[in-house]
């Protein structure tokens, strides 16, 4: 029994080990199931179906970025062609190397985008993709994902972003070379064969062109011979001899010759018509202005090209006993001559090349569409001309006799539908032509740089306030002279290009004018647009950002205008040009050098904000300046993004006749600015309608673009030459928070710190004149005038009596 029990225990049942074929079959089934499951998951990721599909796609994007589709396709191919790919080592290696090159290229492109502020590569890449992953969205470009970031980071550190581009291209070329399994010799032979084929094709085309040219010459020569033969035969057939004199009758022969001419040379034959298409890049351009700096002396008007910077300073030694002349209230303060260089155009970034060649094909297509659309409405028109501008293309059409103009203008929406355009503006008619203009937006807007516009502008450099504004549809630069406007209203919605246009106008004036020729008063309630110009020598006072101070600052300008008119009256001139001419004549005949009055440009960047704080005072100041400031050399530029009637009132419009309208939201706003519709159809980004004082219809222009870097460069150039010299007479002073501007704007401070000194000087000399106060106290003309007014208000001196000197009403006391 024991033996049997032991035997039973040792004789256990053995398990059969699976065969090799069974193991391989099980692995094949596992691979098939895995491939099927992964295929389903990747399919949801490809079509991004639901939250699951988007999550799958974002997980793959986290790894390989925008190469997610390539990764999915490669994974599926590997799953189903595993055995075949094991035998293709060079193909797999080439694909992996090319994929690494693509990852580097995509990531280099990602970090060349200006919107990517954070340059920490791994952190920035993770933040971009994780934000989409958490929100179940696919919104941003992911570059090469985290794998691309890991590869790109050391390459960019060692070789920069451009070097990463080059290395990525090398990886792609190497990968394709390995995938193709070609030898170097095969590639060289292919390149040589391709080069020979191109050379043969070029030689064949050259021979064909030569043969065609010779054939045309032969045909033209044959036609000339036949035409000459026909003329001779007609002449011989028409010869008529006078029986009495035996002379040939020439007149009759010429008449018969005209009748015998073949129809192809008849003068009345009608040529085949084809509309003329003028491209923006081929439009006429003026020669660029020279960029060599011109050096000026502050006390002279004429340029001195060869001034040495180490010249001796010129200081005028004036005699206190100089008699007052007709030019009495002028600045005789000795001044140190400043060498000042005007900025040059090379401070601005060069413009990028523009290519609108593809617009020509679109224009030819639109010409046919326009004619067919008008024909479908029963209107017979012919497109005479098409001009491709920077932002729009203008089609000039000529309607048939009897077609009413309003029938064409009423079809703007139908034309926009037929042309698939954003909007269509119809100009009926074009000023000076018997044609109608149809303006259609281009597929791409060509940016007009400030440097390009300046170089092509024909503005007179002697006119300090003549500045280039933009380019018309025909590509010609358009300038305007602010002195003739004489004030300018700039209005449009947010982001339409107002501030860029104002910066362009300011920069243009700074390019031409010295600090003693033009002065600015800038009012910027937004505090960010004009603050860059602080501390330039052209400013009268720092940029005003407080709306309550702005109304007082405008009142100071009004006071300056009145003072200038009083000065003109004493001198006997009508405007600032006449006064400065008198100054030049005085300087030529006298050792005392007098400074001419500068032009003043008042710039308000946001009028609506001022009208909300002190509408009555601001409106009164603007109206007074608009009515009288032109002759005094004071000009205004008013900008607003809210062109409503409560901001641009009727009185302001009546006194600011020149307007610029940028894109607005409605025809009502357009009528508020221009008194007509049109601005609601503009495209934005500098597209404007310019209506100067001397034109009845607005002109469409593409304004120039000037970047913040360009503005900072020109401002830095000016600041390096001279410091700001602010005029206290224009300082609006301090305002309290409760001051609502009801006082009509700031007046003269109660007492000048030099009042007592000026009073003692007048009582001591028993003479009172602004020129004497200027000489003795070393102050400017404006401050001396204020001191004279305070002395008059205090009863020290009498009122002005024309050209007679003022009477001193007080006598000095022993204590004085």
From Swiss-Prot:
Q: Which Gene3D superfamilies match?
A: 3.30.980.40, P-loop containing nucleotide triphosphate hydrolases, Winged helix-like DNA-binding domain superfamily/Winged helix DNA-binding domain
Could you confirm whether the keyword Nuclease appears in this record?
A: no
Q: What are the annotated GO cellular component locations?
A: plasma membrane
**Which keywords are on file for this protein?**
ATP-binding, Cell cycle, Cell division, Cell membrane, Chromosome partition, DNA-binding, Membrane, Nucleotide-binding, Transmembrane, Transmembrane helix
Q: Where is the composition biased (Acidic residues)?
A: 726-737
Cytoplasmic topological intervals: 180-816
Which residues make up the binding site for ATP? 495-500
First-listed, main subcellular location of the protein, grouped into a coarse class: membrane
Q: Kindly list the places in or outside the cell where this protein is found, as annotated in its UniProt entry.
A: Cell membrane
Q: Which InterPro entries match?
A: AAA+_ATPase, FtsK/SpoIIIE/SftA, FtsK_alpha, FtsK_dom, Ftsk_gamma, P-loop_NTPase, WH-like_DNA-bd_sf, WH_DNA-bd_sf
- Per UniProt, the ranges with Basic residues bias are 1-18
Please list the GO terms describing molecular function. ATP binding; ATP hydrolysis activity; DNA binding
At the top level of its lineage, which domain of life is listed? Answer: Bacteria
Cite the FtsK domain residue spans from the record: 475-671
Q: Which GO terms describe its biological process?
A: cell division; chromosome segregation
Ranges annotated as spanning the membrane: 35-57, 62-84, 91-113, 128-150, 157-179
**Disordered: annotated segments:** 1-20, 726-752
Q: How does it sit in the membrane?
A: Multi-pass membrane protein
Iron: is it a keyword of this entry?
A: no
Annotated function: Essential cell division protein that coordinates cell division and chromosome segregation. The N-terminus is involved in assembly of the cell-division machinery. The C-terminus functions as a DNA motor that moves dsDNA in an ATP-dependent manner towards the difSL recombination site, which is located within the replication terminus region. Required for activation of the XerS recombinase, allowing activation of chromosome unlinking by recombination.
Q: Which family does it belong to?
A: Belongs to the FtsK/SpoIIIE/SftA family.
How this chain assembles, per its entry, is:
Homohexamer. Forms a ring that surrounds DNA.
Matches recorded under PANTHER family: DNA TRANSLOCASE FTSK, SPORULATION PROTEIN RELATED
Please give the record's comment on domains.
Consists of an N-terminal domain, which is sufficient for the localization to the septal ring and is required for cell division, followed by a linker domain, and a C-terminal domain, which forms the translocation motor involved in chromosome segregation. The C-terminal domain can be further subdivided into alpha, beta and gamma subdomains. The alpha and beta subdomains form the DNA pump, and the gamma subdomain is a regulatory subdomain.
What name does this protein carry?
A: DNA translocase FtsK
């Amino acid at each position: 029994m024991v033996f049997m029990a032991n035997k039973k225990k040792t004789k256990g049942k053995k398990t059969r080990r699976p065969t090799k074929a069974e193991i391989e079959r099980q692995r094949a089934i596992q691979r098939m199931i895995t491939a099927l499951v992964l295929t389903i998951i990747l399919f949801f990721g490809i079509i991004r179906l639901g939250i699951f599909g988007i999550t799958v796609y974002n997980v793959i994007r986290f790894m390989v970025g925008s190469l997610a589709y390539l990764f999915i396709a490669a994974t599926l191919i590997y799953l189903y062609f595993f055995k075949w790919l094991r035998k293709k080592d060079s193909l797999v290696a080439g694909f992996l190397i090319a994929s690494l090159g693509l990852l580097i290229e995509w990531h280099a492109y990602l970090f060349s985008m200006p919107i990517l502020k954070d340059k920490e590569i791994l952190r920035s890449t993770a933040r971009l993709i994780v934000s989409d992953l958490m929100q179940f969205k696919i919104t941003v470009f992911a570059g090469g994902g985290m794998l691309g970031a890991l590869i790109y980071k050391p390459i960019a550190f060692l070789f920069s972003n451009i070097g990463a581009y080059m290395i990525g291209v090398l990886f792609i070329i190497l990968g394709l070379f390995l995938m193709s399994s070609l030898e170097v010799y095969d590639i060289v032979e292919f390149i040589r064969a391709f080069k020979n084929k191109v050379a043969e094709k070029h030689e064949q085309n050259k021979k064909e062109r030569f043969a065609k040219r010779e054939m045309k010459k032969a045909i033209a020569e044959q036609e000339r011979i036949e035409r000459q033969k026909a003329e001779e035969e007609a002449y011989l057939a028409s010869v008529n001899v006078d029986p009495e004199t035996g002379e040939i009758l020439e007149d009759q022969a010429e008449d018969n010759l005209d009748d015998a001419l073949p129809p192809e040379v008849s003068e009345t034959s009608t040529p085949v018509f084809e509309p003329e298409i003028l491209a923006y890049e081929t439009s006429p351009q003026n020669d660029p202005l020279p960029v060599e700096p011109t050096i000026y002396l502050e006390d002279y008007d004429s340029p001195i090209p060869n001034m040495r910077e180490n010249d001796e300073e010129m200081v005028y030694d004036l005699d206190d006993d100089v008699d007052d002349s007709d030019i009495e209230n002028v600045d005789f303060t000795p001044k140190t001559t400043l060498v000042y260089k005007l900025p040059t155009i090379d401070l601005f970034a060069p413009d990028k090349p523009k290519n609108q060649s593809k617009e020509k094909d679109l224009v030819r297509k639109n010409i046919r569409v326009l004619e067919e659309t008008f024909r479908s409405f029963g209107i017979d028109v012919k497109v005479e001309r098409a001009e491709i501008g920077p932002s729009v293309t203008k089609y000039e059409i000529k309607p048939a006799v009897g077609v009413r103009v309003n029938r064409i203008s009423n079809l703007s929406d139908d034309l926009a539908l037929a042309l698939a355009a954003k909007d269509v503006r119809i100009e009926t008619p074009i000023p000076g032509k018997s044609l109608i203009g149809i303006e259609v937006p281009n597929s791409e807007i060509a940016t007009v740089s400030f440097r390009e516009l300046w170089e092509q502008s024909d503005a007179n450099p002697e006119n300090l306030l003549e500045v280039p504004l933009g380019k018309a549809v025909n590509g010609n630069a358009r300038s305007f002279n602010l002195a003739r406007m004489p004030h300018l209203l700039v209005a449009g919605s947010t982001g339409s290009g107002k501030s860029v246009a104002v910066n362009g106008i300011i920069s243009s004036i700074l390019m031409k004018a010295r600090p003693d020729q033009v002065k600015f008063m800038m009012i910027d309630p937004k505090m960010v647009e004009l603050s860059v110009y602080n501390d330039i020598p052209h400013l009268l006072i720092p940029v005003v950002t407080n709306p309550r101070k702005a109304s007082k600052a405008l009142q100071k300008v009004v006071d300056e205008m009145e003072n200038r008119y009083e000065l003109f009256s004493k001198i006997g001139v009508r405007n600032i040009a006449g006064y400065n001419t008198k100054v030049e004549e005085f300087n030529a005949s006298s050792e005392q050098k007098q400074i001419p009055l500068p032009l003043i440009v008042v710039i308000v960047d946001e009028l609506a904000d001022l009208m909300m704080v002190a509408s009555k005072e601001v409106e009164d100041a603007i109206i007074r300046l608009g009515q009288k400031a032109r002759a005094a050399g004071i000009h205004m530029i008013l900008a607003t993004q809210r062109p409503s009637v409560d901001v641009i009132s009727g009185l302001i419009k009546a006194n600011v006749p020149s307007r610029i309208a940028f894109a607005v939201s409605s025809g009502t706003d357009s009528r508020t600015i221009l008194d007509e519709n049109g601005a609601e159809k503009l495209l934005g980004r500098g597209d404007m309608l310019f209506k100067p004082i001397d034109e009845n219809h607005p002109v469409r222009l593409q304004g120039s673009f000037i970047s913040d870097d360009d503005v900072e460069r020109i401002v830095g150039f000016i600041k390096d030459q001279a410091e700001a010299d602010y005029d206290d007479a224009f300082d609006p002073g301090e305002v309290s928070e409760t001051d609502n501007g009801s006082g009509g704007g700031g007046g003269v401070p109660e007492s000048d710190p030099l009042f007592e000194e000026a009073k003692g000087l007048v009582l001591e000399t028993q003479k009172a004149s602004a020129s004497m106060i200027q000489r003795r106290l070393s102050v400017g003309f404006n401050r001396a005038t204020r001191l004279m007014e305070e002395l008059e208000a205090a009863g020290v001196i009498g009122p002005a009596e024309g050209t007679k000197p003022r009477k001193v009403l007080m006598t000095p006391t022993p204590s004085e």
